[in-house]
Curated annotation (Swiss-Prot):
It is found in: Nucleus. LRR repeats lie at residues 35-57, 58-80, 81-102, 103-126, 128-146, 147-170, 172-190, 191-212, 213-236, 238-256, 257-280, 281-304. It comes from Caenorhabditis elegans. Belongs to the SDS22 family. Residues 1-22 are annotated as: Disordered. Its main location: nucleus. This is Protein phosphatase 1 regulatory subunit SDS22 homolog. Regulatory subunit of protein phosphatase 1. Gene3D superfamilies: Ribonuclease Inhibitor (3.80.10.10). GO terms for cellular component: cytoplasm; nucleus.
Length: 326
């Protein structure tokens, strides 16, 4: 059993008080409180600055160490070959290391750290979910071995291009929002994809998605889109988010016969006649259309006019409305 049984007292300066020497506890966990047969060890928010020796827990499958002070992944983790889930969310990690022996890992969360490069994952061939949100990653790379991946989350990084993921043919959900991507590309072979989320990038054209026959949700808000052309082949799409763009026409949306949700608020559509195209979508339930020019033209009648035109809709913007007219 590990010797990590009691908290360690260290002296850290308090903010705005350089003279303070009040002790602050680190590693505030006691492994003796866990059953040796426990499949799950949760050391979240314990001010841990290292991963303790957990060899005394032979059946451990899940390790959670969120919101701690880890600056590196301790070599001690290499012995935890039974792990299927590792969560090191919100620490101070700068690189991915010492994970090679964790060959049974199915889920890995390294979000909210300071990681600059994706690497060290070659042996994790069973991995199905990988979270790398809010790091300092500039390039998608070194994912060649992760062919079983079903969910990849790379939001809030510094990525400029969608690349090196074409082999991830089992991918179901892809999140790369809030990056620096200028072109929608590199996803053509991901035919199992059901969710593609790219909000907050610099995309100006919807393209290279015509092969994504299983796509159900497409998120493209906060870009530079001027129209919606390119979505027409996505006939199984249930949700389309193009809010806060430069869109002037809804032409093309009427082809999305399965659409339930259409989010297009904060765009540049001037004519209310554009709304009439949406009346063809019999399954449409929710629309977000406010703060387009046609909204400001007649704010008092806006909601009523939408209700009269889109009789099938049950929610307009953030407010529900009466049941659709039969």
């Amino acid at each position: 059993m590990s010797n990590d049984k009691s908290a360690e007292v260290v002296v850290l300066p308090r903010e705005n008080d350089e003279e303070s020497k009040e002790p602050v506890l680190k590693n505030q966990f006691d492994l003796s409180t866990f059953d040796i047969d426990s499949p799950e060890i949760d050391l979240t928010h314990t001010r841990a600055d290292h991963i303790p020796d957990l060899t005394g827990f032979p059946k451990i499958e899940e390790l959670r160490m969120r919101n701690n002070l880890l600056v590196s992944i301790s070599p001690t983790i290499s012995s935890l070959v039974t792990l299927t889930s590792l969560d090191l969310y919100e620490n101070q990690l700068t690189e991915i290391s010492h994970l090679e022996s964790l060959v049974n890992l199915v889920s890995l969360d390294l979000s909210y750290n300071r990681i600059r490069q994706i690497n060290g994952l070659d042996k994790l061939t069973k991995l199905e979910t990988l979270y790398l949100v809010s790091n300092k990653i500039e390039k998608i790379e070194n994912l060649e071995a992760l062919t079983q991946l079903k969910l990849l989350e790379l939001g809030d990084n510094r990525i400029k291009k969608i690349e090196n993921i074409g082999h991830l043919v089992n991918l179901d959900e892809l999140f790369i929002g809030k990056n620096k991507i200028r072109q929608l590309e590199g996803v053509e072979t991901l035919q199992k994809l059901s969710v593609l989320s790219l909000p907050g990038n610099r995309i100006v054209k919807i393209e290279n998605v015509e092969q994504l026959n299983n796509l159900k949700e497409l998120y493209l808000s906060d870009q530079g889109l001027q129209d919606i052309h390119g979505v027409e082949p996505l006939t199984n799409l249930l949700l389309l988010d193009v809010a806060n763009n430069e869109i002037k026409t809804f032409s093309g949306v009427e082809r999305l016969e399965s659409l339930n949700d259409f989010w297009a608020n904060d765009n540049k559509v001037e004519s209310f006649s554009e709304i009439e195209q949406l009346s063809k979508l019999k399954g449409l339930q929710t629309v977000y259309l406010e703060r387009n020019p046609f909204y400001f033209n007649d704010t008092n009648q806006y909601r009523r006019k939408v209700m009269m035109t889109l009789t099938q809709v049950t929610q307009i913007d953030a407010t529900t409305c009466r049941k659709p007219i039969e």
